[in-house]
Design a protein with these regions (language model features):
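Small-molecule-sensing regulatory modules
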Residues: 2-46, 51, 71-100, 108-299
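Short, structured active-site "lid" loops
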Residues: 46-67
Length: 299
């Protein structure tokens, strides 16, 4: 196979690795990780995967070592990388909420805002972005790279930290408090470079891949619902559906049955309302109600 028919895809190693593999599985791609290998197998001969830390992904995509990859908005900013963002994919190791980079200090610290950081030592993995943030506030402070366990460094090893958090639980567990608003809010992004995206075959492959990933994300937390209803009861059944804003992409699909007095109705709903809406539909006259899983929704 020629290299022009292979898309070099970077997958984030570390905390997002399993969540990324699960997203790809829902999109129709099976990724298999082998012990000590940084080249996971995928059931698509046109994709060649490489495991790379999300922190480094932007520069490898930017310089063409990889055609595309998944990384965080934070690492694009940290590397000041010139990449093309094809999609925002909101997922993480814990939830589908964005992560935030925050300034945190010990609970009893006198630091209350950026100006109080003058001359202080700050530990973070987001060094360059933090320096730019401080400069924007006209503050001069010492920013040191942290290799990990950043939460334990104040107050002995650092006066403050800039750390990523999803729930804030780790910061609270280490007796730290957040100062002010987040420095940066970040979500995963699917990125490429201008050269790869100018290649018609690679562009089509990436666009198709992004479409399927978005479809998998759109289907998360949703299920399909089918039911039969007498035409005479249709208004009551539709009224139940209209009471729940989490039903259907547009409007339920109605199909005739062999019995002219009955129709089949199909809709998409949020999974968390199934237990509420099914009894209501039954009471309104619906019969033969069943729920089914949805893997992808492409609008």
């Amino acid at each position: 196979m020629s290299t022009s028919s292979v898309l070099k895809l970077g997958l984030p190693a570390g905390s997002l690795q399993e969540a990324t593999a699960e997203l790809f599985r829902k999109a129709g791609f099976e990724i298999t990780f082998a012990s000590r290998s940084y080249y996971p197998a995928i059931d698509d001969k046109e994709l060649h995967c490489t495991l790379i830390r999300a922190q480094e992904m932007p520069r490898y995509v930017e310089n063409g070592s990889l055609d595309c990859g998944l990384t965080g908005h934070d690492w694009i900013q940290e590397n000041d990388a010139k990449v093309i963002e094809l999609a925002e994919l909101i997922y993480s190791k814990v939830s589908r909420r964005p992560v935030q980079w925050v300034l945190a200090v010990p609970i009893d610290s006198p630091i209350r805002g950026p100006k109080d950081l003058a001359g202080k030592r700050i530990a973070t993995e987001l060094v360059e972005y933090t320096r730019r943030w401080l400069a924007g506030h006209g503050v001069s402070a010492k920013v040191e790279f942290s290799w990990g366990a950043t939460e334990v460094k104040p107050p002995r090893l650092a006066d403050a930290i800039v750390e990523v958090t999803e729930t804030g639980s780790s910061l609270r567990a280490n007796n730290l408090r957040i100062v002010g608003e987040p420095l940066l809010t970040s979500t995963p992004r699917f990125v490429t470079n201008a050269t790869a995206y100018a290649d018609p075959w690679k562009k089509r492959k990436m666009d198709d891949l992004v479409l399927m990933l978005r479809g998998a994300m759109a289907a998360e937390g949703k299920v399909g619902l089918k039911l039969n209803v007498r035409r005479a009861d249709m208004d009551r059944v539709l009224a139940v559906l209209k009471e729940h804003p989490k039903t259907s992409l547009n409007a339920p699909t109605v199909s005739p049955l062999t019995d002219p007095d009955w129709v089949a109705l199909e809709t998409i709903i949020d999974e968390d309302i199934v237990r509420h809406i099914m009894p209501q539909l039954y009471a309104a006259g619906a019969r033969g109600i069943f729920e089914y899983a949805i893997n992808k929704i492409i609008e």
